[in-house]
Amino acid sequence: MARIYVASSWRNQYFPEVVTRLREAGHEVYDFRNPPHGGAGFHWTDIDPAAPGWTFDQYREGLHHPLAERQFAADLDALRWADTCVLVLPCGRSAHTEAGWMAGAGKRVIVYIPEMQEPELMYKLFDGVAGTLDELIATL
């Protein structure tokens, strides 16, 4: 069985079912929404409610806030722990960065596309794409 880092978005409606189905299939799964160290994951607004409107300098400073440092370390530990990344679309910058890190580390990356997005050629950098949960689980 695989140790899986599921990379996605807080707003992704498919994420909870993906985590559940992967666990039911016997895989170990890192769930950033419910991290093993407790808490409810990381939100920039936990540092500052005005974070969405920050200047670049405020953002750069925020990267060194203890909450940001703690969550970054937890996510990086999880990336190192995992042998596989499942990138669940639709998602944004962080999830794509995480998937790219995993691929660069020589780890398997599968893109799960439950609803067709604009075609992306560079997903060929990864190990495969899956259009259904059954296909995803069979691929793993």
What role is predicted for each listed range?
Residues 1-140:
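Conserved catalytic or regulatory cores that recognize and/or transform ribose-phosphate-containing ligands
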